[in-house]
A protein has these predicted regions:
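Ligand-binding pockets and gating/stacking loops
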Residues: 1-177
Length: 177
């Protein structure tokens, strides 16, 4: 029998829509799976970035909205992380795109999270605050964010040390006390 998303959710027929639809279906099966990864390609926008980025952000937004609607009554048990493995430069290149940069962003949705705030620090855009005068400076290591996530919602003892050997995470403060 085909999966019927909850709450009238509708997933688009694209990479991220199909992937989150599949994850939601497995979550609803209560198989005890604790972690999923989903990829969404196309973000490497070295040329013609404005329309491409608008399309990608729209697809991601609609897919996350459908996922949220679908799993609404289960969101107290779902941690969602949106991240990239690299950032983008602050200025456009000659092809109206951006090249790889240093810092990026991470979006976290989880139960008991201290939401509505930016965690980390904002270095600003002044030339002296940029890495190599062209890149936003990284202020929070993604491993620190992930370490808090595996320690709190997943309640996995020593998970951070197992996942990130030889790394000492800094407190990010993602969760309300």
């Amino acid at each position: 029998m085909p999966y019927q998303p909850g709450g009238g959710a509708t997933y688009e027929d694209n990479e991220i829509g199909r992937s989150l639809h599949a994850v939601a279906r497995v979550i609803r099966m209560d198989l005890g799976i604790r972690a999923f990864t989903v990829d969404m390609g196309g973000w490497d926008t070295h040329e013609n970035q404005p329309p491409r980025l608008a399309n990608l952000v729209g697809q991601l937004s609609r897919a996350l909205g459908a996922f949220h609607t679908d799993l609404h009554e289960r969101l107290g048990n779902v941690v969602l992380v949106v991240m990239s493995e690299f950032g983008r430069r602050l200025r456009s290149n000659k092809s109206n795109g951006t090249d790889h940069g240093h810092a990026g962003l991470t979006i976290v949705s989880a139960p008991r999270i201290a939401g509505g705030v930016m965690h980390g620090s904002w270095p600003g855009l002044a030339s002296e605050k940029l890495d190599n005068a062209v890149d936003l400076a990284m202020t929070t290591d993604i491993r620190s964010i992930l370490a808090e996530l595996v320690a709190k919602p997943l309640a996995t003892p020593n998970a951070a040390a197992t996942c990130f050997p030889n790394f000492t995470p800094k407190k990010v403060g993602l969760f309300a006390t």
